[in-house]
């Protein structure tokens, strides 16, 4: 092993110490929060298997799923959420007020299942345009793809999966703020 000695050794140790204790450049403005360290997976659709990614991710949930969706019409995703709840996973779904009636019956059935709560944003001119969910405070799914059959089958979309407790926590903070709006409408019996 190479061991610096004498003046060179002192200089090396001083430089190493300075490197270790000197803070890196500080981000300012919108980049002020610390960067999130994450395992990142990017998917682009339409393509083979793109529409089934959400179902596979939801199938891996063990404790919690918090989903904020502008659109939730994909019966595969709705069924995956129902199966997760049947396994004991607590499921919360937050939808935009513009959500159409194409899946109203399926969403009502989901909302009445044990371990599931569904809320809809009160009507306003502002959209809740998220297409994201967190699973077990460890994984965040986000991107341009709505939770719809067409998003996975026909539309050009991206889907980003971050395996990061920090990313999931940042989303969960936003989700809790949206979920707590006093004028939200509850769907189902809860």
Specify the residue positions occupied by each region the protein language model found.
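Compositionally biased, intrinsically disordered/low-complexity regions enriched for serine, proline
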Residues: 1, 20-22, 30
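Bacterial N-terminal signal peptides that target proteins for export
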Residues: 1-12
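Intrinsic disorder/low-complexity segments in short proteins, especially the signal peptide
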Residues: 7, 21-25
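Bacterial N-terminal signal peptides
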Residues: 11-20
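HKD-type phospholipase D/PLD-like phosphodiesterase module
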Residues: 24-60, 73-79, 83-190
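N-terminal carbohydrate-binding/catalytic regions of secreted carbohydrate-active enzymes
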Residues: 68-72
């Amino acid at each position: 092993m190479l061991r610096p000695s004498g003046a060179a050794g002192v200089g090396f140790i001083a430089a190493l110490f300075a490197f270790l204790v000197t803070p890196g450049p500080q981000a300012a403005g919108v980049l002020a929060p610390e960067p999130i360290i994450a395992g990142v997976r990017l998917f682009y659709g339409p393509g083979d298997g793109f529409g089934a990614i959400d179902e596979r991710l939801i199938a891996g949930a063990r404790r919690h799923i918090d989903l904020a969706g502008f659109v939730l019409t994909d019966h595969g995703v709705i069924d995956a959420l129902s199966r997760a709840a049947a396994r004991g996973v607590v499921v919360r779904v937050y939808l935009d007020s513009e959500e159409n009636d194409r899946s109203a019956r399926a969403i009502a059935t989901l909302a009445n299942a044990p371990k599931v709560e569904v809320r809809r944003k009160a009507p306003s001119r502002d959209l809740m345009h998220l297409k994201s969910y967190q699973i077990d405070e460890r994984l965040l799914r986000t991107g341009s793809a709505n939770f719809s059959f067409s998003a996975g089958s026909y539309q050009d979309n991206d889907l980003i999966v971050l395996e990061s407790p920090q990313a999931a926590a940042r989303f969960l903070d936003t989700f809790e703020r949206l979920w707590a709006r006093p004028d939200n409408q509850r769907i189902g019996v809860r």
